[in-house]
């Protein structure tokens, strides 16, 4: 619950006019020091699409506050929920990409000065390809590929926070 509060997650129950499509979805705000710059909505059940954004909004890195908390390394996750798990639950600085197809070239400049950048890639073809692509852009990248069908969230539920800390320590 503390992680949800820190991430300022909410559920849309009484939407504003024109936002009825977000009812009963998890609201995930994109926060900066200036305030909310975007909100994405995730289905709580099996509704499709799983994720929805505000009409006309552009994509951003999620959890940019991690840049101010990180020291020599930072992690990248696929998606907001995995980022919340790694950063707010495991206390490992992480930013998130809202889907591997939403990576923007200028993000590499934000990550270039870290000694190490760890990509916790999902255990699917998209995660594998994302790791290969990002490795061409970031010389300081270390890809930690999840097993087939796994991601940060499922690995946390199975192995706990120490799993990620050990992966990072073993790669340094």
Where do the PLM segments sit?
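Conserved beta-strand segments of alpha/beta enzyme cores
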Residues: 93, 140-142
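Short, acidic/turn-prone active-site loops that include or flank metal/cofactor-
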Residues: 97-103, 122-125, 146-149
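Short, surface-exposed amphipathic charged segments that create phosphate/polyanion-binding patches used
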Residues: 109-114, 153-165
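A charged alpha-helical hairpin associated with nucleic-acid processing machineries
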Residues: 70, 144-147, 162-172
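Acidic beta-strand-to-loop metal/phosphate-binding motif
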Residues: 76, 114-126, 145
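Short, aromatic/basic amphipathic alpha-helical patches
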Residues: 129-138
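Phosphate-handling DNA/RNA-contact segment within nucleic-acid enzymes
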Residues: 2-115, 130-131
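Switch/connector loops and helix/strand junctions flanking conserved nucleotide-binding motifs
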Residues: 127-129, 154
